[in-house]
């Protein structure tokens, strides 16, 4: 095999190891996420139920993303992470809020959220942003989601209950991530960039 023309981390994160959170575990994660919501102030409103996404593990931490609507029509999005050695511990949570929701954007094919969780140092001092990306396909029949950097697949995730989570290098050497969803036969159904087009 010839050398790789693009030297970037591929499939760096473990695939999902657990079912989507439920019961007491979901309650624990919700408490951590809502504690982070307090820092956003009262203007966001009262959060509703949290929709959890598949877990991904990288660099010794497991990340579980989630979203929740508030009674003011905003969407909270963030993730809870924890150390993976033994029982979950050293919890941390990040959360943000947006007015941009899928119902207001019929042109969207995939509803995406993202959070930078680390960095990967490449050649010649270039740095990739290791980015957690979670989303909901807005097209029927999605079975697998992939993350691509300059048309190179760098991560993939089986769609679980119409949700997926990716963890991949982004913003590296001028290239940014595209997310694609595919049906069970490998036909592309939709593609979205993490960045708004000008």
Task: Label each PLM-derived region with a short phrase.
Residues 1-113:
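Long, contiguous interaction/targeting segments characteristic
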Residues 53, 115-118, 187:
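A generic signature of intrinsically disordered, low-complexity regions enriched in glycine/proline
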Residues 99-134:
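Extracellular ectodomain segments of secreted/surface proteins
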